[in-house]
Amino acid sequence: MNADSKAPDFLVVIPARLGSTRLPRKPLADIGGKPMVIRVAERAKQSLAHSVVVATDSPEIQAACDEHRIECLLTSENHPTGTDRIAEVAQLLKLPANALVVNVQGDEPLIPPKLINQVARTLAEHEQCVISTVAVPITDAAEINNPNVVKVVLNRSGEALYFSRAPIPFVRDPQSSQKTMHLRHLGIYAYRADFLQAYTRLEPASPEQAEALEQLRALWNGYRIAVHTAPEAPPAGVDTPEDLERVRQLLARS
């Protein structure tokens, strides 16, 4: 039996907003004749998700989804984070407390469907956790000290101890560095629906604000995060015009 056939029942939500500083109107950027958010939704539909929903505060994005027959929910303009937007979707859809919701970023048109299945499976397998996510081994030493690369340290059960932009774990003795595996966090998450509602009631945590990493709010409040360690990173998402051109060329060749 294919491992993916064992994936649990889950829903994919894709938060999408037009406000992007580095790439204006990013979700609607054209990639081979389709808006990027539609490309992301089509990749998500190749996963084992029972449904895929775009969550947006933009009527333009909603119109693009309608044109391409992608389910879309118009949400509040006042959400401070994508997680808050997903929580509203869970509420609008009246999801049961134990439902699994996978958050796929709207700028990941090359995300592997198997990775979506895996993050859902990881949460299903860790019943004591309320969130799951993914990390990959860092192979470029320069990334360890790069604050734009978020690192994560795990316990022996594969749960997150801490996420940071700092080099963690810090290697005090260079001779032991070869035995130390640094992990890069990837921004894909699965949540239990009841936790999403609890999350919106939590105050921002001081480590979260210092690092600008919203997942630290969960750890700060005693919630547990399961982390799947994948062998290698998936294709990078789209943050800049250069990224957009790279993705266009890749999809044109496929």
Swiss-Prot record:
Biological pathway: Nucleotide-sugar biosynthesis; CMP-3-deoxy-D-manno-octulosonate biosynthesis; CMP-3-deoxy-D-manno-octulosonate from 3-deoxy-D-manno-octulosonate and CTP: step 1/1; Bacterial outer membrane biogenesis; lipopolysaccharide biosynthesis
The secretion signal range is none
**EC number(s) stated in the UniProt entry for this protein:** 2.7.7.38
What this protein catalyses is: 3-deoxy-alpha-D-manno-oct-2-ulosonate + CTP = CMP-3-deoxy-beta-D-manno-octulosonate + diphosphate
What InterPro entries does the annotation carry? Cytidylyl_trans, KdsB, Nucleotide-diphossugar_trans
> Can you list the GO cellular component terms from the UniProt entry?
cytosol
User: Which parts form a coiled-coil structure per UniProt?
Assistant: none
Key words, A-Z: Cytoplasm, Lipopolysaccharide biosynthesis, Nucleotidyltransferase, Transferase
Q: Which NCBIfam families match?
A: kdsB, PRK05450.1-5, PRK13368.1
| Protein name per Swiss-Prot or TrEMBL | 3-deoxy-manno-octulosonate cytidylyltransferase
